Swiss-Prot record:
TM region positions: 14-34, 45-65, 69-89, 97-117, 139-159, 161-181, 211-231, 246-266, 268-288, 294-314, 331-351, 353-373
The protein's name in its UniProt record: Probable nitrate transporter NarT
Keyword Disulfide bond: no
Keywords: Cell membrane, Membrane, Nitrate assimilation, Transmembrane, Transmembrane helix, Transport
Gene: narT
Induction: Positively regulated by the two-component system NreB/NreC.
Length: 389
């Protein structure tokens, strides 16, 4: 795989996704440091942490479409140039408003996810798409890189200088993509409105979007709220909290290709149903945990299932929507991103209302149960009885 042109582009785009996600997620692991210099309330913190998800989700639809029109090279390159501005602005932030504004435009780093999942399948045969997209999805590890490295570096050189150091990395990858990006990538120029009309009539798009809303939403949400949550609720050291959050993110990321492989080898919908059953159990564990050990078990369970689930879903998307892949990838990945926006806000609201966050995790279990019913419906329409496939 890696000796081919596709293998090279897969590697390049995966590394580009790493950098994009590093930028997208930079605020969360540094928030314990930022709030020492910027006067912010817990309510404002939850909003600041969630805001990058908005643009990072909404832009996934046009980014996926544009990738089919102009190619991944130019969408990645332009995104990196744009990211330089909010990164610098964040390093100068002195008010909650400045943090929110910079965080909003950092969403560009999250939006580039739909670029690769649209471009990468063009280089591989159908039976390898699940694995290829799973490998590309490992670029999510950029979130873990920020969680692992940003806090200890900030402890040495300060959070502002840590943020500015990202400017070098992003500028470097803009140059690399400009030089090595594929200008010969196959273009698919189906009119956007025609694609949307076709997609809007296909119930599978709604189901896949909802499932990804849960799996990728959990991945994003836990990465956002865990550092601050662990410090505030369990009294964990800031650096240790960043490392624990990084473990959650890394585990989910490395298991994503496993989900793709399972989807290539077995019936992806049936495997996804098993995955969601285990995720529901993990959510229930979180809903009853008051001790850090039990909370850790619940988090790791969610991490495993979110990672495998993400890989399985993006095995299904290109197989169901080959002619509208760019727009379908954009819509599904947008819903996944939005799935990461609401949980931190809900957790904060529930904690303020009840004095505990337990009920918020039970909501995740309920959402998972609803997803199981939709999976059963799709499976029976596509394959008949669950005993088949």
């Amino acid at each position: 795989m890696y000796k081919t042109k596709g293998g090279f582009q897969l590697t390049l785009q995966t590394l580009s996704l790493v950098v994009g996600f590093m930028a997208w997620s930079i605020i969360a692991p540094l928030m314990p440091f930022i709030k020492q210099d910027v006067n912010v309330t817990e309510g404002q913190i939850s909003i600041i942490l969630a805001i990058p998800v908005i643009l990072g989700s909404v832009l996934r639809v046009p980014f996926g479409y544009l990738t089919n029109i102009v190619g991944a090279k130019w969408v990645f390159f332009t995104s990196f140039i744009v990211l330089l501005f909010p990164i610098f602005f964040l390093s100068q932030a002195q008010t909650p408003g400045m943090l929110m504004a910079s965080g909003f435009f950092l969403g560009v780093g999250g939006a580039i996810f739909s670029v690769g999942v649209t471009s990468v399948p063009k280089y591989f045969p159908k039976e390898k798409v699940g694995l290829a997209n799973g490998i590309y999805g490992m670029g999510n590890i950029g979130t873990a890189v920020s969680s692992f490295l940003a806090p200890p570096i900030a402890g040495i050189i300060g959070w502002q200088t840590t943020v500015r150091s990202y400017l070098i990395i992003i500028a470097l990858f803009a140059l690399i993509m400009f030089i090595f990006g594929d200008t010969q990538e196959r273009k698919i120029k189906v009119p956007l409105m025609a694609q949307m009309k076709t997609l809007s009539k296909n119930y599978k798009l709604y189901y896949l979007s909802y499932w990804y809303f849960i799996t990728f939403g959990a991945f994003v949400a836990f990465g956002i709220f865990l550092p601050n949550y662990l410090v505030n609720h369990f009294g964990i050291d800031k650096v240790d909290a960043g490392i624990r959050s990084g473990v959650f993110i890394a585990l989910a990321t490395f298991l994503r290709p496993i989900g793709g492989i399972l989807g290539d080898k077995f019936n992806a919908v049936k495997v996804l149903m098993i995955d969601f059953v285990v995720m529901i159990i993990g959510a229930i564990i979180l809903g009853i945990s008051d001790h850090i050990a039990l909370f850790t078990v619940g988090c790791l369970t969610i991490s495993i299932c979110a990672g495998i689930g993400n890989g399985l879903i993006f095995k299904l998307v290109p197989s169901y929507f080959s002619n509208e892949a760019g727009s379908a990838n954009g819509i599904v990945s947008m819903m996944g991103g939005l799935g990461g926006f609401f949980p931190p806000l809900v957790i904060t609201y529930v904690a303020n209302l009840t004095g505990s966050s337990h009920l918020a995790f039970i909501f995740l279990a309920v959402f998972g149960c609803i997803a199981l019913f939709t999976m059963r419906h799709l499976y029976q329409k596509e394959y008949g009885s669950l005993k088949n496939g």
